[in-house]
Amino acid sequence: MEERELLLERLELALDRIREIPGEDWQEESLQHWKEYFTAVAKFLLLIEDTRQFLEQGKQNTATLEELKQRNHALYEDILPENYENSFANPAVAVKCLGEEFGALAAFLYTEMRSLIGFTYEGRLDELVIRMELFSEVYAAFVYEEQENHRLPSYASIREILYWFVSDYADVAAEARVRELVCPGNNFAADIIRRAELTDLRYLYAYGEYVGENELAMAKFLNSLPEETINTMADTYTEGYRIGFEVTGKDLSKKAAVDVRYQLGFERMMRRALENFDKMGLQPVIYRAAASILYNPSIYKNGFYSVSPNRQYEFDHKDDKALFLDKMYCSRKLEVMHTAFEKYKTEARGYAGPAVVETFGEKDFAPVNKPEAVKMTDEQSTLMVEHRAQMGQLQRQYIIEEERSFTIIAFPIPEVGDCFEELFRETIRIN
């Protein structure tokens, strides 16, 4: 049996169980909030499966703009600011409904399931399978204790399930992340940039990222600009990259891959930029900004991404790794990253560095430090500093800093206000 067939079989087994969850009764009245939680997450996972089928059947290409908007909204509506105060992804809500002991852990589990949106659009079936299986395993542990002993499972037993998930799949994730970083073979975003009909804004929904007014307005605005202006923007960006190598005496001809980072809506500029990089002998590596705990998500995004649908949601979960962070976890991460870089060491030497399109003009954000959100202990913070230093040292063994360069160019986003178009044109002139 082929790997894909095996994965589909495992997926269907997990889904069979997940489909039953909304209709199941819990005997203990005191545990009804847990039924609500598992039902909410199960319904989200069934929407993920519906989206997978939608994509497999090619409906992404035939659906109307309104249909694509509705699906995108359905996938993200639970964490939008107007709904977040009632969402189990919100640690404050999870703690209030599910208790102080389990609340943050439950919010983390749902957040990890939400990382499936991007994986679904990329067709990464293995990522779907392992998370659906994880959710099913956690649910089974709760149901067993509720039915047999009329109580919750121990916190330690559930944390252990989640701990072994992040540990067991650390090697797979490390290899995938290094491959994404240094091997130009992942063409998901590059294909959208190169092949999409950019005047048809339906293309924005092919990523699986949240599409809001910023992305739509940016794409529309870039579509309104003359070709000459787009060329100027892209050429300034790519020439800045090439000149970075030239002025520092680094040999660009030895390099094969450029790490392209941008926000959705800039595709018309990025198409010209990729053509320019092609002429330099560079193929793009373009990866999604991480959402899963296995890929080290951050409020500071690298890769391709959209304006956050809810920055408070991201802030609430920025330290979720503290649920697992210990010396053994750090050692495991370091070990699997070393193995992954060793596997792709030739490709790593061809990594030329990042070419970044940054944005400015987002509305001010004053994060709320919620007591219910996961926090690092002082010991964990120290451990994390050491771990990051070791990871950086490891990466520098394979991606030689003295042989790479970078470029950064910045543009305003529509959220900046009525002055957006004027400010954008002035930014082009200054660049």
Ranges and model annotations:
Residues E2-N431:
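Active-site bordering "gate/hinge" segments
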